[in-house]
Amino acid sequence: MRGVLPPGATIGLHPHETNSEVIYILSGTGQVLCDGVYEPLGPGACHYCPKGHAHSLQNTGPLPLEFFAVVPEEP
């Protein structure tokens, strides 16, 4: 899934109880919060949220944050 967050926008903290998620940053800057740790993200960065964990994504820059997310479903 491709997503775009405007400056200051966030995808709030949410759990991944039955799957994991990989986020790849295409453009812009932001930060992810995972397991209580903030991680800065920019173009080319990748974030992995394992199954059973929670995370959030926030655009901290002046431009849109464009990303690609993969959420594999387990059978």
Regions found by a protein language model. Give the residues of each.
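A generic "binding-loop/recognition-motif" signal
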Residues: P7, T18, V37, H53, ...
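A short glycine-rich, His/Asp/Glu-containing loop-to-beta-strand
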Residues: M1-L13, N19, V70-P75
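Ligand-binding loop in jelly-roll beta-barrel domains
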Residues: K51-P75
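Short acidic-glycine-tyrosine-enriched beta hairpin
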Residues: G36-K51
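Glycine- and acidic-residue-biased ligand/ion/polar-headgroup-sensing regions
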Residues: T18-G30
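Histidine-centered metal-chelating micro-motifs
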Residues: T10-G12, Q31, H47, K51-S56
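A cytosolic small-molecule/anion-sensing beta-strand core signal
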Residues: M1, L26-S27, G42-P43
